[in-house]
Amino acid sequence: MSVNLKGRSLLTLLDFSPEEIRYLLDISKQVKMENRSKLRTERFKGMTLAMIFEKRSTRTRLAFETAFAEEGGHPIFLSPNDIHLGAKESLEDTARVLGRMVDAIMFRGYKQETVEKLAEYSGVPVYNGLTDEFHPTQALADLMTIEENFGRLKGVKVVFMGDTRNNVATSLMIACAKMGMNFVACGPEELKPRSDVFKRCQEIVKETDGSVSFTSNLEEALAGADVVYTDVWASMGEEDKEKERMALLKPYQVNERVMEMTGKSETIFMHCLPAVKGQEVTYEVIEGKQSRVWDEAENRKHTIKAVMIATLL
């Protein structure tokens, strides 16, 4: 099957087929090898990327900015002080203006509706760098990291521990379903996966021979796991719920005992970062030999560069 993603936006991986995701991962491998050899091809020379941030960022900003600049492009950082989406000027009109000025737009903020409207009205590729609902570029980096470790994706068992309805867990569940993996969400009933996306993923795995499931039982979830993944207990904008979340999620902390419960010495630990060491994960695990969080963070750049290559060239 010939894959052509030119002009496409990345808003959620629900919009992408397994073949298209595979295409992006193959480009990611290529650009990572180029990066290792310090090869710079200036693929984006003469192009401009608008990067709109409603939420602060380390990895997403670094990944988009370095990926675009390394290839000769000009990234423009726009903070809430620089651009007011929907204030004084409608979001639709701002999108139209941006589309006349730049070649692509990255948005990191709150509402999924915002990134969708930017894509609808700008006429250029738009990339979701994180919304309250989805984090697709993180999920691509997660897939790349898993494949680097196991040489495959199909059949790999991934367990997400903690707040399983957050944007990272949601996008990881979609990615695993699309690629025929076995995804287990493990957390309290109060924070189980979004029912609409969970149902969509249950339909997807019928075609990909994967599986998606939810349980609050650690032993059931962790048995035979290849990957144990977690995220902060209170996401950005939810800091006021931290005490409540700590009480709910303490049983789901990833520690050495949890890693041993997989029954596999080759199980790896992943985290999208930033991490609160001592809360969702212990220092010993995130700094231990099973941790792949730094590879995962680096792979944000390579997968993001791959997305831009595929959609702009």
Swiss-Prot record:
Pfam families: OTCace, OTCace_N. It comes from the Bacteria. Pathway: Amino-acid biosynthesis; L-arginine biosynthesis; L-arginine from L-ornithine and carbamoyl phosphate: step 1/3. It is found in: Cytoplasm. Belongs to the aspartate/ornithine carbamoyltransferase superfamily. OTCase family. Reversibly catalyzes the transfer of the carbamoyl group from carbamoyl phosphate (CP) to the N(epsilon) atom of ornithine (ORN) to produce L-citrulline. This is Ornithine carbamoyltransferase. It comes from Thermotoga maritima (strain ATCC 43589 / DSM 3109 / JCM 10099 / NBRC 100826 / MSB8).
